[in-house]
Amino acid sequence: MSEFVTVARPYAKAAFDFAVEHQSLDRWQDMLAFAADVTRNEQISELLAGAVAPETLSRTFIAVCGEQLDEHGQNFIRVMAENGRLLVLPAVLQQFIELRALLESTVEVEVLSASALNDKQLANIAAAMEKRLSRKVKLNCKIDKSVLAGVIIRAGDMVIDGSVRGRLERLTDVLQS
């Protein structure tokens, strides 16, 4: 997967720069998301992995995407097909989203909790994370019963484990050492 990220980076950067220049970030993100979903289709991924001529591949892929791709999006798909890189479209999308977050000075923060959090709790978490990261945050809340109670917060490579499960694991480690 890390090789996909490396391969995807220049494509994501090119798409991102074009989208910024033409003030079409939303449109490009939507096109990339749709194209990435198409690559996840079992029949399409088999076609992409097979020995198919790039022209045929790009024509087929663009036909499947239909009107979801504008002219520039179709050209982008053609270039990726010519270079045999359509399978990395999900990684291109992820890189594009990360570049957009940097531009907009936001960071996506994942919040795992055992049950749904109320608006006040979410506001407190958002405020604390914005202060700590010095950036705007976008909370992505998920419910995970294995947390037991408390929350686990992830932002990039930073993890704050305030869960009962985490405390029990740390206590177990201390008792076993």
From Swiss-Prot:
Q: Name one GO cellular component term.
A: plasma membrane
Membrane topology term: Peripheral membrane protein
Q: Mainly localized where?
A: membrane
Query: Subcellular location, in the record's words?
Result: Cell inner membrane
- Pfam family membership, one: OSCP
Q: List, alphabetically, the PROSITE patterns matched.
A: ATPASE_DELTA
Determine if DNA repair is one of this entry's keywords.
no
- In terms of superkingdom, the source organism counts as Bacteria
Q: Which is one GO molecular function term here?
A: proton-transporting ATP synthase activity, rotational mechanism
List keywords of the entry alphabetically. Answer: ATP synthesis, Cell inner membrane, Cell membrane, CF(1), Hydrogen ion transport, Ion transport, Membrane, Transport
- What does the record note on quaternary structure? F-type ATPases have 2 components, F(1) - the catalytic core - and F(0) - the membrane proton channel. F(1) has five subunits: alpha(3), beta(3), gamma(1), delta(1), epsilon(1). F(0) has three main subunits: a(1), b(2) and c(10-14). The alpha and beta chains form an alternating ring which encloses part of the gamma chain. F(1) is attached to F(0) by a central stalk formed by the gamma and epsilon chains, while a peripheral stalk is formed by the delta and b chains.
The job of this chain, per UniProt, is described as: F(1)F(0) ATP synthase produces ATP from ADP in the presence of a proton or sodium gradient. F-type ATPases consist of two structural domains, F(1) containing the extramembraneous catalytic core and F(0) containing the membrane proton channel, linked together by a central stalk and a peripheral stalk. During catalysis, ATP synthesis in the catalytic domain of F(1) is coupled via a rotary mechanism of the central stalk subunits to proton translocation.
Q: Member of which family?
A: Belongs to the ATPase delta chain family.
This protein is called ATP synthase subunit delta
Q: What species was this sequence derived from? A: Serratia proteamaculans (strain 568)
